[in-house]
Amino acid sequence: MAILFALFAMVSFTACSSDDDETPSTEDIKTNIVGMWQSTHISGWDYDDTDEENLIKVDQDIPEADSYRMLFKGDGTCKEYYWDDYKWHLDGTYKYEVSGNKIIFYDSHGDIEGTANVLSIKGDVAIFELTLEEGPQDKHRTTFKRVY
């Protein structure tokens, strides 16, 4: 849950595309999101590894040991996994819904855990973008590859 909190509870994602034809539709997302996705790259802004969690500019690939996976099921549930001790561990289970080009995540009480704008979802690659708590100028993008 710490990873989902760090990624999604930072508030919401905002699309930057100036071409509306590039923004995936609700149906595109619903059709293509089902499956296991692994984070592979981050860009924009992120938090450093200190206790202060300072904002830093990033544009880097994510080593597998630091990546996480999200399993989206067709029934509207999502599971998040992190890598530790040479295996994947369940980190949290959520419900999700797709509205426009957004994926809205709900905790077990039905409260919104986070919202992600899907900038792109084509083939085996998806790009999500979020706005960090510090303000709308602080965007964080995560690229995912479909594992299966």
Label each residue range with its predicted role.
Residues 11-15:
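C-terminal motif of bacterial Sec signal peptides marking the signal peptidase cleavage site
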